[in-house]
Amino acid sequence: TAAGLTCFQVPGVPAPVQDTAPRTGERQQQEQVALAARDAMAGQLMGKLMQTLGSAGPAAAIGVCREAAPQIAAETGKKFGVAIGRTSFRLRNPKNAPPSWADPLVAAQPADPQFVPLPDGQLGALLPIRLKPECMLCHGPKDQILTEVREALATHYPPDQATGFQTGDLRGWFWVTVPAGARSPGTNAPTSANEKL
C-alpha cells in the first residue's frame, strides 16, 4: 500500500508516546518488531529512491514509489509477519489511505511514535516520516518543483495533495499492524530502532 514519493528520516526515534495499556514483555516485543519492520522497509525504499534519483532523475523516482514500494511493503510484511505501509494526512496516492485503526491518529497528526492495542492481541504502530532536503524535489512548494516532475505527478497522481512541504515537515507515517506472538527475524540479537537509513 505504498505508492507516493515519500522520503524517509527516522530521527533518533523519540520515546514512544505511551497509552494506558501495561507494557508486557509481549507488548515490548511487538513494538520492537514494528520498529524493525519500519527500518527494513524505509532502508530498502530509500536506497531504491536514491539509486533512481542518481541514475534517472526525480521524475523517474516517482515510479519507484508507484511500482517498487508496494512490492517492498509486501516483502517486508512477509519477512516480519506484519502488515505494513505508509500513509499521510495529505495523500499522493489514494491507495495509501490508513488502516481503520489508524484513522483517528492520522487525523490528530502525531509527531511522535504511537502504539495502539488492537483486538486479538495485535498492536498497531504509527511511526512518523519527516522530510529530508532531497525530498523537496517532489514534495516541496509547487513553484520550486521541476516542470518534468510536475508533469509526471499530474499524469500519475491527478488528485495529488503531497506538495507544499518544507524540509523537516511531518510528511506522514509508516503504519504497522503486528500480530500477537510476532518475533523479529533472527532474534538472536536485539532489534535496533536506530538503524541509520
Stretches found by the model and what they are:
Residues 140:
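Short Cys/His-rich local motifs and their 1-3 flanking residues in nucleic-acid-associated proteins
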Residues 137:
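Short, cysteine/histidine-rich loop/knuckle motifs that typically chelate Zn2+
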Residues 1-4:
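Bacterial N-terminal signal peptides
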Residues 7-134, 143-197:
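Extracytoplasmic c-type cytochrome modules immediately beyond a signal peptide or single-pass transmembrane anchor
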